[in-house]
Amino acid sequence: MSGRLKVLTLLLGAWMFMFGFLKFFQPISGWFDVQFQQSHLPHQLILPGKVSEMVVGFLFLLPWLRRSLTVRSKDQILLTACFILLIQMFVAIYVHLQPGVPANVLPFGIKPPVVPIAILFLGVLTAFDVWKQIQAEKA
């Protein structure tokens, strides 16, 4: 695993797990509920949304926690985490772009989707590094 990939997986893992965990506590829990309501997403997806962020964070951290995993298993886990993160960030961008969602309930109070785009970029960069690693292993 390259140095950049190590940093990216640790960073994304810690961020996503922390973001998901904090959404269970006020005031962030209330903000997350408002985001869902004002963007017309199904109310039933609030809990799965919170849990899925924690799961993605755990998946990014799993190669660090289970050193006994094979390289192939680590690559598959990281690509799965990147794919789920991609979907989550597209939803987050959608939420940021909804006119009814006020800036004060969004991360850092920023209405433009700067945060989800930055996290999406890091996820794509991680997936690219994993893909390069897979290609190098095949050669």
Please place each PLM-identified region on the residue numbering.
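Membrane-interface extramembranous regions
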Residues: 1-139
